[in-house]
Amino acid sequence: MAFEIAFNPSGVIERAKTILNDYGAKFFTEDKLWVWLLDGQREIALQVPEATSVTAPLELAPGVTQAIPATSHCLIDVPRNVTGEAIRPAARALFDEMRPGWATEGGALIVKHFIYDPERDKKTFEVWPPAAAGAAVECISSAMPDDSSMASNLFAVDSRHANGLTDYVVFRALNKLTGNPQFLTHAKNHFDLFMYSCGKSADAGLLLSQREAA
């Protein structure tokens, strides 16, 4: 008889149990499946930062260098001041060439540009003019999911990733059984499906080269 699975994290766990044919938790405990589900949400946040985007006002520190919210892992955009004036992205190289002393200029309450180089530091960005005490901007950043999403049974990522999360949980489960070549193939297939759901191509060979520890 057909039955409906809820569209929430518990539903992802139920789908994974169905695919793994392990309703009795003979091979994988439910606690372990939940851990993998949280891992999957964190991986989605890294692969698709917009999936966990959070928009909030951010009070700036006096000066040029600013930190993104502590609960986030990268910056997405700084679109405007809290008073409404637009902020445009800029390249540090251009400022260094055109205004060599830009980082030492006087502080202002209205920011005009922000500079972000995630290859150097994902957790900080710079603003111009340097911020004066009391300056604040609208900050869009990518939050890193924590355990609270599991306790509330709510997705920490966009719910469109539910199917991808199911594939991730199944991948992690089968990756514990890769001593069997058949499980290795199935694990790779589910990992590929997860990565495709994130808009990425995947070669899971390196991830599956060793059996996952218990």
Which residues fall in each region the model found?
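Glycine-enriched, solvent-exposed interface loops adjoining structured elements
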Residues: M1-A214
